[in-house]
């Protein structure tokens, strides 16, 4: 289920409850001229993401847009610096264990297009 990002990503991740999983789809921003994400790999991954997350009430995902191409390409992009995102698309899996520790797993770039890797990553 697609959830709105109501606050900062840091706050959203801090509020992941124990034994809960939140997915974060790090995506290229939409190009105002084409009305599509500027990154072709993101455009290719979106149908897979949307199909999986829209068809499940158990899987929660928020979409985060990393910026236009020049913003993304800067080494100081906040998603590169704060969250260690190196490519788009990236699907982050954030799970808080019973002890309260937040575990992070990432499915990066072309791996997001591999249906087997994607299904295994989201546990469907």
From Swiss-Prot:
**Any Pfam family the entry gives:** TXD17-like_Trx
Q: Which domain of life is it from?
A: Eukaryota
Q: Which residues form the Thioredoxin domain?
A: 37-124
Localization:
Cytoplasm; Nucleus
Note whether Nucleus occurs among the keywords: yes
Give UniProt keywords alphabetically. Answer: Cytoplasm, Nucleus
* A molecular-function term among this protein's GO annotations: peroxidase activity
GO terms classed as biological process:
cellular oxidant detoxification
Q: Name one GO cellular component term.
A: cytosol
UniProt-listed InterPro entries = Thioredoxin-like_sf, TXNDC17-like, TXNDC17_dom
Its chief place of residence is: cytoplasm
Q: Does the keyword Ribosomal protein apply?
A: no
Q: List the disulfide bonds.
A: none
Catalytic residue list: 39
Q: Which PANTHER family match?
A: 42-9-9 PROTEIN-RELATED, THIOREDOXIN DOMAIN-CONTAINING PROTEIN 17
Recorded family membership: Belongs to the thioredoxin family.
**Protein name in UniProt:** Thioredoxin domain-containing protein C21C3.12c
Organism annotation: Schizosaccharomyces pombe (strain 972 / ATCC 24843) (Fission yeast)
């Amino acid at each position: 289920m697609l959830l709105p990002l109501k606050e900062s990503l840091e706050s959203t991740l801090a509020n992941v409850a124990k034994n809960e999983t939140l997915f974060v789809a790090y995506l290229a921003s939409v190009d105002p001229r084409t009305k599509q994400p500027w990154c072709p790999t993101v455009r290719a991954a979106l149908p897979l993401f949307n199909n999986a997350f829209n068809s499940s009430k158990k899987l929660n995902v928020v979409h985060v847009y990393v910026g236009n191409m020049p913003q993304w390409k800067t080494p100081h992009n906040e998603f590169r610096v704060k969250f260690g995102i190196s490519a788009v698309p990236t699907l982050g899996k954030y799970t808080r264990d019973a002890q309260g520790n937040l575990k992070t797993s990432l499915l990066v770039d072309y791996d997001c297009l591999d249906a087997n890797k994607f299904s295994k990553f989201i546990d469907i």
